[in-house]
Amino acid sequence: MPLRLSSLFLRTLREDPVDADVDSHKLLVRAGYIRRAAPGIYTWLPLGLAVLRRVEGIVREEMDAIGAQEVHFPALLPREPYEASNRWTEYGENLFRLQDRKGADYLLAPTHEEMFTLLVKDMYSSYKDLPVMLYQIQTKYRDEARPRAGLLRGREFIMKDSYSFDVDDAGLDDAYAKHRAAYVRIFERLGLPVVAVSATSGAMGGSRSEEFMHPSVVGEDTFVRSAGGYAANVEAVTTVVPEPVDCTDAPAAQVHRTPDSPTIDTLVSRSNELHPREGQPWTAADTLKNVLLSVSLPEGGTQLVAVGVPGDREIDLKRVEAGIGGALGIGGELEVEAASEEQLRAVPELVKGYIGPGLSREDALLGTESPTGIPYFVDPRVVPGTRWITGANVAEAHVYDLVAERDFTWDATLEACTVREGDPAPDGSGPLEIARGMEMGHVFQLGRKYAEALGLKVLDNNGKLVTVTMGSYGIGVTRALAAVAEFYHDEHGLLWPRNLSPADVHVVATGKGPEVLEAAEEIVAHLEAAGVSVLFDDRPKVSPGVKFRDAELLGVPTVLVVGRGLADGVLELKDRRSGTSRDIARDRVVAEITAELQGQEGPAAE
């Protein structure tokens, strides 16, 4: 049956919704594909659901093709499994928590690693049962602090998550490779260009991790790539570490007055004015900027840490968050922000704008072994023998020629600085180019983290209990749909790839006489009989101009106009993407459209 606009549950809008800040959000709402229910939560309307089912179908076909089996878990889950894996606390405020009438704790699932693990534990006990790959397409929930961009960053979203279970790492490698190849095929079929980038594992844990990033100016993520093939999420980029410097002839560190110099710019200016260096002027790269940060701990409360970075670099809090859990020995990603004024006042030994590690190793004021007890981490560029200007922990004073390791030490190095265009790739493949992108999919080699936490073991071929190794693989289904809408649109509306469009053809009946609608009904019936799905604009009291504007907004790739020329047995066939049109004979409509569909079944129809 055709989708008739005269009865379809649809309302198109002429104006953009006031809360929409990206084109995909504006157009999906205006075209009547989705409707906002609450911040970050959307209702799917009939046309939107039709596109969503097509996206899900592609994902399902590719998962089935690699031998994964579909299951379906509840979204409402008990607390206990997430306590066992420590993610009840690691997820922090991003987790939707609730209680039943008896006071038992539950959550709305952000992911399902624990539940998949327990299911396999409940059913399998021998190496003969493995390997196995399971997947689901299910609604997920995350309490985003600032939901934005419509479906791209919501609180409720649909995700395909799959999991592999193997006896050994070789099996995990095989499952990982199968999923990676399946993801490449999925994004090709969706018509979305992606870059596979190295990534951090965050709260998921595990070892190897890659993201599939769709380059986009509206993307929230930053990634880097080089001409030589290196690609990584900016949080996963490792700094090329300089060689240690011979400091045998370095002068002793000295404290100098530096009035009104609490910033790097003022410090450099004062240094060149009051304490000039022979041979070359001081620059920001000669300074060591020490910043106090507040880390939110999983069990509640905060931890102050100090991070020292070259003064010509800025701190990237996302990179800090990716590594600070490991540096503190806590694990997982932790939220980090600049220390508050109140937190700074609680450490009177440190003077804002003039914070430093101390005048010597014996007088250290930063580090877990120092009087403040504040863990001190430095950028990897701070290597033994490097000389710095840094704070003296006295107002309007700085230390000059403070030598790393000779005069101060640190607890650990931490990737904390913003990655810059032109920085060297860690693998030596050339300078880095920075790009914005949307994370479309993520594949993890989880290893044995969840299996150990939840006791998933099987008997191996020697009768010995071994811990199962796991992989986790996710694709944001609703985000992928939004990304397609963001990538394929113009100033008039959506431009669906043919294999995702809610219908194959949009038939528009124009003209006032009953013969026009009768002819359109007959043509639609013939198209449907030939297996062509039709969106039929049969609205009787709507002007041709409104119908044409709606056809452009809705984005079905082929538009058939029945009206002008009907008396001569001629119809108009429009290509929504190119804007071109041509006349075709009425008795050739079905043959020409079916031939066109057979030759243009996917994103190649663009």
From Swiss-Prot:
Protein task: Catalyzes the attachment of proline to tRNA(Pro) in a two-step reaction: proline is first activated by ATP to form Pro-AMP and then transferred to the acceptor end of tRNA(Pro). As ProRS can inadvertently accommodate and process non-cognate amino acids such as alanine and cysteine, to avoid such errors it has two additional distinct editing activities against alanine. One activity is designated as 'pretransfer' editing and involves the tRNA(Pro)-independent hydrolysis of activated Ala-AMP.
* GO MF annotations, alphabetized: aminoacyl-tRNA deacylase activity; ATP binding; proline-tRNA ligase activity
Q: How does it assemble?
A: Homodimer.
List this protein's GO terms for biological process: prolyl-tRNA aminoacylation
- What GO terms fall under cellular component here? cytosol
Q: What is the official name of this protein in its record?
A: Proline--tRNA ligase
SUPFAM superfamilies named among the record's database cross-references: Class II aaRS ABD-related (SSF52954), Class II aaRS and biotin synthetases (SSF55681), YbaK/ProRS associated domain (SSF55826)
Q: Which UniProt keywords are present, listed alphabetically?
A: Aminoacyl-tRNA synthetase, ATP-binding, Cytoplasm, Ligase, Nucleotide-binding, Protein biosynthesis
Report whether GTP-binding shows up as a keyword of the record: no
Classification via HAMAP family:
Pro_tRNA_synth_type1
Q: Where in the cell is it found?
A: Cytoplasm
State the domain notes: Consists of three domains: the N-terminal catalytic domain, the editing domain and the C-terminal anticodon-binding domain.
Disulfide bond: present as a keyword of the record? no
Which Enzyme Commission numbers does its entry carry?
A: 6.1.1.15
InterPro entries cross-referenced by the UniProt entry: aa-tRNA-synt_IIb, aa-tRNA-synth_II, aa-tRNA-synth_II/BPL/LPL, Anticodon-bd, Anticodon-bd_dom_sf, Pro-tRNA-ligase_IIa, Pro-tRNA-synth_IIa_bac-type, Pro-tRNA-Synthase_IIa_type1
Which Gene3D superfamilies does this UniProt record tie to the protein? Anticodon-binding domain, Bira Bifunctional Protein, Domain 2
Question: Which family does the UniProt entry place this protein in?
Answer: Belongs to the class-II aminoacyl-tRNA synthetase family. ProS type 1 subfamily.
The organism's lineage is: Bacteria, Bacillati, Actinomycetota, Actinomycetes, Micrococcales
Which transformation does this protein catalyse, written as a reaction? tRNA(Pro) + L-proline + ATP = L-prolyl-tRNA(Pro) + AMP + diphosphate
Question: Predominant location of this chain?
Answer: cytoplasm
